[in-house]
UniProtKB/Swiss-Prot annotation:
The lineage of its organism: Eukaryota, Metazoa, Chordata, Craniata, Vertebrata. Homodimer. This is Inorganic pyrophosphatase. GO terms for molecular function: inorganic diphosphate phosphatase activity; magnesium ion binding. Its EC number is 3.6.1.1. Its cofactor is Mg(2+). It catalyses: diphosphate + H2O = 2 phosphate + H(+). It comes from the Eukaryota. Mg(2+) 2 binds at residue 121. PROSITE patterns: PPASE. One of its GO terms (biological process) is phosphate-containing compound metabolic process. It is found in: Cytoplasm. Its main location: cytoplasm. Mg(2+) 1 binds at residues 116, 121, 153.
Length: 289
């Protein structure tokens, strides 16, 4: 979407790497708190964290001031999603809807599990491979209820409103009809993607069936309500940084100079990326249960 830009700090694929978001005035903002949930009527904003086909597990840093995008770290090592045959990296553009929060203190009535303490996730199924940190408008089509290590982790299915075929997609049944096998592959991917790391398969509510657009929008709205409580300090933030520059009713709102000071304290941008381990391209073969 026009008006937003990114600024990288440090080298990609390094522990210090960060992607900050800026508004149309060039001021630093939080992609979690400052980008509006809606881009237009019935259109949601999406923050792209991971471009399709890539492996680096990039995500909004919810506990860091201004919530830049950074690569996830496990036991001191940068995380890369394995290529679980026949897939290569992420099979959609993957990211989050801003101004949403899956509250870890809220037991979801549909799943019986509490939220995962993150913005709600989005799988964008359009034809364009988006860029890390890109802000796009998406049309919501449906949702999948994943249970990740006992936590509710909703996966919204959506399409970029600028996709040439966006007009043909209005609900989850259109995905089933026009992209046969894609939803089944999505369930399979989420079920097994942690297996190469020695983790068990993930589980799902609703017998791994996708719920429709209206159901998905209701879930998104509920996570938006949880976010409102978070950013206005009406609920326990569980270590999340709510620093923002635009939410007038938030006690965490700061001025542009304070936001700039956060970024200026970090390493400068680096033109060359660090070397990605060669085993990131390895295929993993795993028998489905």
């Amino acid at each position: 979407m026009s008006g937003f830009s990114t600024e990288e700090r440090a080298a990609p694929f390094s522990l210090e790497y960060r992607v900050f978001l800026k508004n149309e005035k060039g001021q630093y903002i939080s992609p979690f708190h400052d980008i509006p949930i809606y881009a237009d009527k019935d259109v949601f904003h999406m923050v792209v964290e991971v471009p399709r086909w890539s492996n680096a597990k990039m995500e909004i840093a919810t506990k860091d001031p201004l919530n830049p995008i950074k690569q996830d770290v496990k036991k001191g090592k940068l995380r890369y999603v394995a290529n679980l045959f026949p897939y290569k990296g992420y099979i959609w553009n993957y990211g989050a809807i801003p101004q949403t929060w899956e509250d870890p203190g809220h037991n979801d009535k549909h799943t019986g599990c509490c939220g995962d303490n993150d913005p709600i996730d989005v799988c964008e199924i359009g034809s364009k491979v988006c860029a890390r940190g890109e802000i796009i408008g998406v049309k919501v089509l449906g949702i999948l209820a994943m249970i990740d290590e006992g936590e509710t982790d909703w996966k919204v299915i959506a399409i970029n409103v600028d996709d040439p075929d966006a007009a043909n997609y209005n609900d989850i049944n259109d995905v089933k009809r026009l992209k046969p096998g894609y939803l089944e592959a999505t369930v399979d991917w989420f079920r097994r993607y942690k297996v190469p790391d020695g983790k068990p398969e993930n589980e799902f509510a609703f017998n791994a069936e996708f719920k429709d657009k209206d159901f998905a929008i209701d879930i998104i709205k509920s996570t938006h309500d949880h976010w409102k409580a978070l950013v206005t300090k009406k609920t326990n933030g569980k270590g999340i940084s709510c620093m923002n520059t635009t939410v007038s009713e938030s006690p965490f709102k700061c001025d542009p100079d304070a936001a700039r000071a956060i970024v200026d304290a970090l390493p400068p941008p680096c033109e060359s990326a660090c070397t990605v381990p060669t085993d990131v391209d390895k295929w993993f073969h795993h028998q489905k249960n």
